[in-house]
Amino acid sequence: MRYLTIALSKGRLTDMSVEIFEKIGIDCTELKSSTRKLILSDEKNKIKFFLAKPADVPTYVEYGAADIGIVGKDTLLEEGRNLYEVLDLGFAACRMALAGPAELQGKIDELNIKRVGTKYPNITRNYFEKTRRESVEIIKLNGSVELAPLVGLSEVIVDLVESGRTLKENGLVVLDTIADISARMVVNRVSMKMENERIQKIIDGVRDELSVRG
C-alpha cells in the first residue's frame, strides 16, 4: 500500500488541521514535534505530511505531489488550480472584501475607482471585470494593504477581513463582500480515482468530526 501524502498550509491552519486529523485516528506525533524533517509520517496509516506556504499547497495537489491539501479558500480563488474542493472545514473563517475610506460607504455604485491595492490580484481582477464590469489598475502589495488608501496609492483595497478592527482603526470600512473564506480540503483529481476508498474514508471521518462539533 502506497503512502497518501497530505500538504498542510504553514501557520494557524496547521494546528487546527492536526487537531481534526488526530480525532479521526491519524497519528500526528511527528507533525507536532520540533524535528527539522521536511516529510513527516504516520507509519501505521501510511500517510505522509509536509508543510508548505499556503500559496503552494494547491500547486502540490494539482500536480500530484500531494494527494490531499488543507488550504484557505482565498488561496484557492487566487491560484485557480485544477483540483477537487471536497470539504469546507469551517475554521479560519473570514471574508474577502472591498474596503476603502469611511466616506465612501453606501456609495459603491457611484465610485469611479481607478486603482486598487491588494495581495490578491487575480481575485481582484475577476471581481472588477466580472462582477462590477469595470477596468481598474491593480497594484500588487505584500505588506499592510490598509496603508494604500491612506497614502494615496489607491482609492480602495481588496483584502481579507476578520474582525474589521484594523480597518476601523485606520478609518476604513467594508464596501462590499467578495467571498466568504474558510479552510478547505482539496484532493488531486487522479488520486480521487486511484485511491478513492482511502481518501473517501478520510473525507467522511473529517466531515463526521465537523458535524459533531456543530
UniProtKB/Swiss-Prot annotation:
It holds the Pfam family HisG. It is found in: Cytoplasm. Keywords: Amino-acid biosynthesis, ATP-binding, Cytoplasm, Glycosyltransferase, Histidine biosynthesis, Nucleotide-binding, Transferase. The keyword Kinase does not apply. Its EC number is 2.4.2.17. It is an enzyme of class 2 (transferase). GO terms for molecular function: ATP binding; ATP phosphoribosyltransferase activity. One of its GO terms (biological process) is L-histidine biosynthetic process. Pathway: Amino-acid biosynthesis; L-histidine biosynthesis; L-histidine from 5-phospho-alpha-D-ribose 1-diphosphate: step 1/9. It catalyses: 1-(5-phospho-beta-D-ribosyl)-ATP + diphosphate = 5-phospho-alpha-D-ribose 1-diphosphate + ATP. One of its GO terms (cellular component) is cytoplasm. The keyword Cell inner membrane does not apply. PANTHER family: ATP PHOSPHORIBOSYLTRANSFERASE, ATP PHOSPHORIBOSYLTRANSFERASE ATP-PRTASE. Heteromultimer composed of HisG and HisZ subunits. Belongs to the ATP phosphoribosyltransferase family. Short subfamily. Catalyzes the condensation of ATP and 5-phosphoribose 1-diphosphate to form N'-(5'-phosphoribosyl)-ATP (PR-ATP). Has a crucial role in the pathway because the rate of histidine biosynthesis seems to be controlled primarily by regulation of HisG enzymatic activity. This is ATP phosphoribosyltransferase. It comes from Ruminiclostridium cellulolyticum (strain ATCC 35319 / DSM 5812 / JCM 6584 / H10). The lineage of its organism: Bacteria, Bacillati, Bacillota, Clostridia, Eubacteriales.
